[in-house]
């Protein structure tokens, strides 16, 4: 059930960001019901592979992630809050490491998430930034040779 509260001061924004951090670090198929406690009903989610809007679509992104990577997990390495905590929507950045298994090997992907929170502290915009070429494609045997070749062609000298 949604709780109505104000999230317009630095302390309440920090508390909400810590709640978001805890959610991502304990994310599992059984915790997906908590999405509605964190995201607004029309929230937008974008990463290098998709752009979706609304709680059902965001939940589907995570359901798919667990369907193809059942043992994946996030570790939030840091949180940066905007210099002006009263800015609406409040904007923050989470630096993270995503751990997954590719061809029997545990690998990590480094990235960050840009979050915008409304006055009630719900995420209204979630944008993931990470280098799919370096962090994923180069780790896939079928594409790694192509990515190395492209890197050599593009690099100066």
Functional labels for PLM-detected ranges:
Residues 12-22, 47, 69-71, 124:
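Short, mixed-charge, low-aromatic patches
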Residues 7, 22, 45-48, 102:
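A general structural-boundary detector
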